[in-house]
UniProtKB/Swiss-Prot annotation:
SUPFAM superfamilies: UDP-Glycosyltransferase/glycogen phosphorylase. Gene3D superfamilies: Glycogen Phosphorylase B. It comes from Thiobacillus denitrificans (strain ATCC 25259 / T1). Keywords: Glycosyltransferase, Lipid A biosynthesis, Lipid biosynthesis, Lipid metabolism, Transferase. Condensation of UDP-2,3-diacylglucosamine and 2,3-diacylglucosamine-1-phosphate to form lipid A disaccharide, a precursor of lipid A, a phosphorylated glycolipid that anchors the lipopolysaccharide to the outer membrane of the cell. The gene is lpxB. GO terms for molecular function: lipid-A-disaccharide synthase activity; phospholipid binding. This is Lipid-A-disaccharide synthase.
Amino acid sequence: MVAGEASGDLLGAHFFDALKKNRPGLTAAGIAGPRMVEAGVKAIYPSEKLAVNGYVEVLRHLPELLWIRARITRHFLRERPRVFVGIDAPDFNFTLEAALKRAGVPTIHFVSPSIWAWRPERIERIKQAVSHMLVVFPFEEAIYRDAGIPVSYVGHPLADVIPLQAPTGAARATLGLGDGPIVALLPGSRLSEVDRHARLMLEAAMQVRAKEMDVRFVLPAASEAARERIARAAQGLDLPLTVLAGRSHQALAACDVAVVASGTATLEAALFKKPMVITYRVPALTARLMRKKALLPWIGLPNILARDFVVPERVQEAATPDALAADVLAWLGDAARRAALAVTFDALHRDLRQGASARIAAAIAPYLEAAR
């Protein structure tokens, strides 16, 4: 198994737990994060090594990434696993999967890259690399079927894990927060994302605080290194801020509004039925390249799935403290708009809640049996 960054680690843990239910003696090893390790996966390398994004950052880390991929490829070719599972991290995994598939190892890829949003030409590379694609959004299934790639729609594991009714009161009690308005700030799990978004979000929080004196802020840090950078970003700011060690789901359950860096966390916020502002910043060169290849007007998963701007997006030069603060204040001041959005997000949640564990186990079972 190979997973990249925090979201892949979480999905990888759910994936392996699903497989173990009917195969308690099953073992797995590869590139894994702490949640996968807790689920029983042996980490040959930590998944944080793959947590880089954007053309500029990838180029900076390219020698190490290529070295790790060469080493892990040799390891799997030598050990000959019954099945290989790549979880997200497509640019890393597809080359590895292609080598293993050529050697006769079945390759399962969990979570399709967003070929429907940009770089659709990747479908040909996927065809060479992947024995079976497991997709988490219903519209993705037809894309792979039309391309002649075996595919199963399994639903999204997070939709199964997150309750249909957000436990707001319990989360606030656990975190020691009061009854006043709470705004969650989620700058991203990668350190580069924290560097680009933490100060931006905190400055926006200062402006919100100036208009709403009783508001409090909660910010989950994905790692100790992220927590240290957040502390530096918050220096000199007088904010009622609670920084958490992880616990992003509790932060989202507790909040009234969230400011979220684009990524899986936007889907999590939607599953918790929370109004949000989606933001993202990347280096200017990366932004120019991505805009040229983009197929959709949205970047956030809630908007992509709704095919509409149901929540605001503030990207690149539009991502300013003024804009984020105005969006947060607009959500806080409009209960009817918040209630209407919750109805939209409830329907989305029910669509994605498919019992992913059972579907994953059923899709991969033939490959495990054939390799016995």
